[in-house]
Amino acid sequence: LIVLEGAIELEITREKLPLIVKGFLAALIILIGNIYVLQFLFKALFGMEGAPAVLFAIPLAIISSAVAIPSASSLLQLEREFVVYESTFSDILGIMIFNYALRQLESQQPLLGAEPMVSLGLQIIGVIVISLLITYVLFRMMQQIDHKVKFFLILALLILVYAFGKVLHLPALVTIFIFGIFLSNVKSLLPPFLRKTLDLEATEKELHEFHILTAESTFLVRTFFFLFFGFSIQLSDFTSTSPVLYGLLIFLAMFALRYVYFTATSLKLKPSPLVYMSPRGLISILLFLQLNEVAFINLEESPVDERLLLIVILSSMLVMLLGTMKKDQKKEIEIQDEEAPLSVEMDIEPQSLTEKDNKNL
């Protein structure tokens, strides 16, 4: 649901292609950079290395689009669109890298290598073709089904496709992602010979309703997971200051890397508001809790636990809040300057007026 909602949010046009590429590169480079930095920190602080360090680093490195996109409403239009693309790509790439790393490590295969990378590339190409066909079939279903209840049926079919992908060891999330991309950009991405057989104008309203249903379902899932995560945290667990200090150090390292990236790409030392837009959230929690099922990881004895994750999440959200507040204050000052009335003060002394001027007055 989270990947599907993020993909539906992406509007792909020729005019926005440079911005999309920038958002994708920022998400990929910062994500990979954070994983390497966190691996180094985990080894230096906790003596952790190898597979556990990689799997613990990935959830902490992912930006939460669920938090970043609504928080970017006060930014300029280009900055807001960049946040949408970067955070969505960070979510999707992070989940894909996590599942890929988990599959490789559980099968005791190397993370990087020619064979696994070629295999992954071929799988993604196959998934794109499958997603194209699924999009066409679901559009036909939207037009053929007259019953009121049809959107949950479509979601059920997508869940079925995801389950088949997991069973066949395919990147199933890529299927959902590509489907969402095709769904929201069907007029520009669907081949002409398939578009001719579909009444796209008639399905626009239904697509909008499907988007709303997906967004509300995702919001419900997010809410419950945040509640469950909150229930799992006990204040008595924070008797030691070590998790707080380690969490702050990890967040500052990731924030410094983000600052360096945006400084290098914009050639400006003054931090952009985009630097602050890197909150952690639901995806980090979900992937972190998934580590409970990994055989070679023991979360109860690990120094990287829920307390450290909570500190990183709260720190990232607090920095984002301060960054957006600073942006709002600048905007308010600029608006006040623009709306200030133009006034000209003239000092005229009555004594300087001549008799002729007095008569005219």
Regions found by a protein language model. Name each.
Residues 187-216, 329-361:
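Intrinsically disordered, low-complexity non-transmembrane regions of multi-pass membrane transporters
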Residues 92, 124-133, 160-170, 186, ...:
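Hydrophobic transmembrane alpha-helical segments of multi-pass transport and channel proteins
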Residues 16-76, 136-137, 235-334:
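Transmembrane alpha-helices that form the ion-translocation and gating core
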Residues 12-16, 69-128, 141-148, 189-195:
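Alpha-helical transmembrane bundle and helix-membrane interface signal
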Residues 1-22, 142-146, 158, 162-246, ...:
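Membrane-interface junctions of multi-pass transporters
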Residues 1-3, 49-64, 119-130, 171-184, ...:
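Structural signature of hydrophobic alpha-helical transmembrane segments
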Residues 35-41, 91-106, 160-174, 222-235, ...:
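Hydrophobic alpha-helical transmembrane segments in multi-pass integral membrane proteins
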Residues 17-32, 78-89, 146-157, 215-221, ...:
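Cytoplasmic-side transmembrane-helix entry/capping segments in multi-pass membrane proteins
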